[in-house]
Amino acid sequence: GCDIGLSLNFDRITYLRPEYGYATRDVNPSKFPSAENDGLFSVNLKTGQTKLLFSFADLSQDLKGVDNTKQKINHIQLSPDGKRCIFLYRWFDNNGVKHSRLYFARLTDGYLALLADEGMVSHCNFIDETHVGGWMRLGGRDGYYCIDVQTGYYRPEAPGVLTEDGHPTFCGRYLVTD
């Protein structure tokens, strides 16, 4: 069985995207934990003990003026070996515009790398232990991309063929999306 899980603050999801959170919960954003005490957590599935892995303060340190109540983590994916993960850090600016970043993390040593930072990242997944694929904006163009998590090098996948966002799954040489 599984021993460790990854999780996030579902009150933030409920507040920012009620259709994805728990709509029956009464959420008060003024009671959100500080940016230093909220973010991506590991959860011991046997004891329920949680540990903050990466805080919103970590993820937004180079950004100016991010409102603590208007940021969230979403779309957490584990690597096939369970030693790495990717996730989206999203925030809304003062004009209500959503911005997204794709992060890669090694769970074994706390290494964190920013993979995509051009404002738009949608659904992503691991292709293998060292490559991530998904729909995002890179080089100023939206599309499916493969990113080498060790080098940051990226290449388009099926340009001109897959022209819309979806929920990708990768298996060997296959890409399945909707």
For each predicted feature, which ranges?
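Loop/turn-rich, solvent-exposed surfaces of beta-rich toroidal or solenoidal domains
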Residues: 140-142, 159-178
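Beta-rich catalytic cores
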Residues: 36, 72-74, 98, 120-122, ...
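Short, conserved, GDST-rich strand-edge loop motifs in beta-rich repeat architectures
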Residues: 7-37, 88-99, 178
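Blade-terminus and WD-like Trp-Asp/Gly-His loop motifs, strongest in beta-propeller folds
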Residues: 1-4, 8-9, 76-84, 123-133, ...
